[in-house]
Amino acid sequence: MVATTITYEQPLNEPMRICLRLEHLFRQLHEHIREPAPAASHLAMLALLKALNVIDRPDLKTKLTQTLTQQTSTLLQLKHSPEVDNHKLQGLLDTLDRYVTHLHQTTRKIGEPLRENAFLTQIRSHLYNPAGPCNFTTPAYALWLQQPSENRINDLQNWAKEFEPLINIVNAILQIIRESTSPQNIVARQGFYQQMLNATSPCQLIQLILPIEKNIYPEICAGKHRLVIRFLPLDVNNNENTKQIAEEISFKLNCCRI
């Protein structure tokens, strides 16, 4: 089924930025991990190692735990609401509790076995070179890419298993925040829209939905107090700064918070 709309997302705090980056990389990993071509294995490897770079921070478990705990606290307040399915809510709360327990009980850094793998470390050290890891910088990797497809797929799946708990946690956090509110129909005048934000109940994630056929995209600038959006036309051959659309733009906007 061909998509007719595109959803742009703007994170407004560090946990959301981490989760969106990881979701993006985990999707790339999932798309290519089972494909037999060496080029697909290369793309899967790049996604795996970039994800490892994203999580290479000492405060990751703390930030994820704080986010899960905050979401749990907010969801608990819904238990006595007549509009809430308490059975479904309790299942979600139990899931979040398991994730928090897992993070507390994990004594090592997430992804530590991958950091200790000398083969992956060699590739990772060349990840951001202009050409990335290539034949003359990482000959072992060049040889690995020529191994039978079943060997490469098996290796990638074994390495990706290290991320499985993290994938589940990231998916849960993002699903809860995305479903916390419903999008509103908005009209931007002369390609510009601004809105004051509630600082006492801060927005955590901005979602903006546009029809693909319009061939326009947003520049989103959001802080604690104000949201500003400019709409620009897609022009891949323009050598000058793209000018803001000078017409009314209808779109959907969702300020997600929990």
From Swiss-Prot:
Is Cell cycle one of the keywords?
yes
Q: Which UniProt keywords apply?
A: Cell cycle, Cell division, Cytoplasm, Septation
Q: List, alphabetically, the InterPro entries matched.
A: ZapD (IPR009777), ZapD_C (IPR027462), ZapD_sf (IPR036268)
Pfam families documented for this protein: ZapD
Please list the GO biological process terms of this entry: division septum assembly; FtsZ-dependent cytokinesis
Instruction: Please provide one cellular component term from the Gene Ontology annotations of this protein.
Output: cytoplasm
Report the family membership.
Answer: Belongs to the ZapD family.
* Family annotation (NCBIfam families): PRK05287.1-4 (NF003656)
Q: What does this protein do?
A: Cell division factor that enhances FtsZ-ring assembly. Directly interacts with FtsZ and promotes bundling of FtsZ protofilaments, with a reduction in FtsZ GTPase activity.
PANTHER family recorded: CELL DIVISION PROTEIN ZAPD (PTHR39455:SF1)
Subunit (UniProt): Interacts with FtsZ.
This protein's name: Cell division protein ZapD
Q: Which species is this UniProt entry from?
A: Coxiella burnetii (strain RSA 493 / Nine Mile phase I)
